[in-house]
Each structure stands twice: as structure tokens, then as C-alpha cells.
Amino acid sequence: MAYKHILIAVDLSPESKVLVEKAVSMARPYNAKISLIHVDVNYSDLYTGLIDVNLGDMQKRISKETHHALTELSTNAGYPITETLSGSGDLGQVLVDAIKKYDMDLVVCGHHQDFWSKLMSSARQLINTVHVDMLIVPLRDEEE
């Protein structure tokens, strides 16, 4: 099956390059579009009123770092990137919204194979939320 628009969900870890390479290898033969997306957690949900944290400054700094990292991934992809998206909130809902808006038909995401990922896998959440084809790529941390 030839996909027309592939969405790569990245966490901006060094392993994100593996996902981009995998998606490019699938897109190139069919001249499919590729887009990148990164979803930040909503930091205001993590902090209570008991902790004095300037969330506005923190989110601006993180947003700037996210933009830089996405731009770098896009530039080094070796293939045209149609959209570079960044969102915050519920991962599944943000992806569903992007899929509908940009008419995407495949999501490529990674799954870290460590203890915590087995307990709290975002890939598992996506399987129950996203209603297009998915490719879940097993990732190993670089130091392994």
C-alpha cells in the first residue's frame, strides 16, 4: 500500500533520527509527504500551587528548544518535510487533530524498550486513539 502523507511523532531524543530515516525510506518510492510532530506535556498540569515555578518562562524556553530541534531534524532528513508541528497536551488527541487537519494516513512512532516504557507506553495509548495505520519502531537508547 502506498501512503500519501506520513506523520512522524518524535520525542526529540537522539533516536528520533531512526524514525525519520524509517519514514523517509517508506515515503521516497511513492513520493509521499512527510511531516514531523512533537507533543510537549502540559506543564501546568504537573505542578501544584505549592511549588513556585515560573511556567511561562519555562514553556517559552522549552518551546524555543523544541522548535530548534524540529528544525534540525527536518533539515537533516534528506527528504522534504511538508509540515513541522508542535503541540502540547494529550498526545493521542493532538495526533488525531493533526491527522484530520493534514489528511495523514500513517503515523510512525518509536517505543523505548526500557522498564518505564513498559509501564507507561505512549505507543499503547496511541493504538487505542489513532485510527490510521501505525508503524511502531522499537528504539534502544544510544548508550546500549
UniProtKB/Swiss-Prot annotation:
CDD domains: USP-A-like. InterPro entries: Rossmann-like_a/b/a_fold, Universal_stress_UspA, UspA. Pfam families: Usp. The gene is uspA. Its main location: cytoplasm. Keywords: Cytoplasm. Required for resistance to DNA-damaging agents. It is found in: Cytoplasm. Belongs to the universal stress protein A family. SUPFAM superfamilies: Adenine nucleotide alpha hydrolases-like. This is Universal stress protein A. Transmembrane segments: none annotated. The keyword Cytoplasm applies.
